[in-house]
């Protein structure tokens, strides 16, 4: 039985990946390692907690001693590394926390995997999941490709760029078998409401202001999280060693247009008069170092592995909104306590 370590598996993207692997690969033993910080929640994976091929371990990848002990207790055939601090606003407020988790934490995992696989790396794989933000900001035209030079502009993207470089360096220097992917903005269920779509869904439900940075004309490419999980599965099993794949949704939206679409759908779902939610839009001071546009060229993964998004944005957004409306208890539980303090500080 193969033993696979998935880090950050109680988070947003990680929980979808863990669920897919546990349900699809009964011959794998899945170890889910998560520190259960504010964005990690065991409720996200409650439906699989009693599966015989699943084990949860609470721990922090920043703790080198803990990681070394974990690898001494388990012989892993693969590592899917999703654990990360990922919110740009929080990185501006506390960049060192992002360095610790995203850089030092990744280093600890790389070192442990290198030592464990030193004498036999056949069939092993370290899969590092990263972001399109490492490429910086696009102009009005063009797409990020796997050959686009790195040009990070926020502490978050700088920390992820650093971790990407270390993964590749370990591949070149030590022969560590790795694959790496850079993805566009994800959306879907179990997404902590600090990112645009879940934040605004939650605010509309509660008749709170919808804070839009600057003029709202920043453009992002949106990818349904379940499509991303399928791509991760495919890259882990069929991707070529030492290769990078971009994963995108082929789905660009200006922030303000997306917000207005959300408002229209939510008014309809909640039985409110059209325009009610849109009246909540509030333009706020722009974020420092705000990248104008991200857009992914995902032709490589399509060409080499046959992946493309299967869920349209309309379908995905409908599923996402319905999930949040049907899981208000989950929303209330994750938006209590420290979340309220952070929100007040960030958007007041």
Question: Which role fits each region the language model picked out?
Answer:
Residues 48, 142, 193-201, 262:
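A glycine/serine/threonine-rich, flexible loop-to-helix segment
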Residues 157-158, 191, 253, 292:
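Residue-level detector of secondary-structure boundary/capping sites
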Residues 41, 140, 189-193, 251, ...:
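Residue-level signature of the cytosolic catalytic core of signaling kinases
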Residues 4, 17, 30, 37, ...:
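C-terminal substrate-binding subdomain of Rossmann-fold SDR/epimerase-dehydratase oxidoreductases
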Residues 81-82, 186, 194-195, 277-279, ...:
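Short secondary-structure boundary micro-motifs
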Residues 118-119, 127, 136-140, 175, ...:
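Proline-centered turn/helix-capping motifs that create local helix->coil transitions or kinks
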Residues 1-186, 226, 236, 255, ...:
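N-terminal Rossmann-like NAD(P)+-binding domain of SDR-like oxidoreductases, especially those catalyzing
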């Amino acid at each position: 039985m193969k033993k696979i370590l998935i880090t950050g598996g109680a988070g947003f993207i990680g929980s979808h990946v863990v669920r897919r692997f546990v349900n699809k690969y009964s011959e794998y033993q899945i170890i889910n390692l998560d520190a259960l910080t504010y964005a990690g929640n065991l409720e996200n994976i409650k439906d699989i907690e009693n599966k015989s091929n699943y084990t949860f371990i609470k721990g922090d990848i920043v703790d080198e001693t803990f990681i070394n002990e974990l690898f001494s207790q388990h012989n892993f055939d693969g590592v899917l590394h999703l654990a990360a601090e990922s919110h740009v606003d929080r990185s501006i407020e506390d960049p060192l926390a992002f360095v610790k988790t995203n850089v030092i934490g990744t280093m600890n995992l790389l070192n442990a995997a290198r030592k464990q696989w030193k004498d036999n790396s056949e069939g092993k794989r370290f899969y590092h999941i990263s972001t399109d933000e490492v490429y910086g900001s696009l102009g009005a035209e063009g797409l990020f490709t796997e050959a686009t030079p790195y040009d990070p502009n926020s502490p978050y993207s700088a920390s992820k760029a650093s971790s990407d470089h270390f993964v590749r360096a370990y591949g070149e220097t030590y022969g560590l078998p790795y694959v790496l992917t850079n993805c566009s903005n994800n959306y879907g269920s179990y997404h902590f409401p600090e990112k645009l779509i879940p934040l605004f869904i939650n605010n509309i439900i509660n008749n709170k202001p919808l804070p839009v940075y600057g003029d709202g004309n920043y453009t992002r490419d949106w990818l349904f999280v379940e499509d991303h999980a399928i791509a991760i599965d495919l890259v882990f099993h069929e991707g070529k060693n030492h290769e990078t794949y971009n994963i995108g949704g082929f789905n660009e939206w200006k922030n303000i247009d997306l917000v207005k679409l959300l408002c229209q759908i939510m008014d309809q779902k909640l039985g409110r008069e059209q325009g009610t939610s849109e009246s909540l839009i509030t333009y706020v001071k722009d974020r420092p170092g705000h990248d104008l546009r991200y857009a992914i060229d995902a032709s490589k993964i399509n060409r080499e592995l046959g992946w493309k998004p299967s869920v349209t944005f309309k379908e995905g957004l409908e599923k996402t909104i319905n999930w949040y409306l049907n899981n208000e208890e989950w929303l209330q539980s994750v938006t209590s306590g420290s979340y309220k303090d952070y929100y007040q500080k960030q958007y007041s």
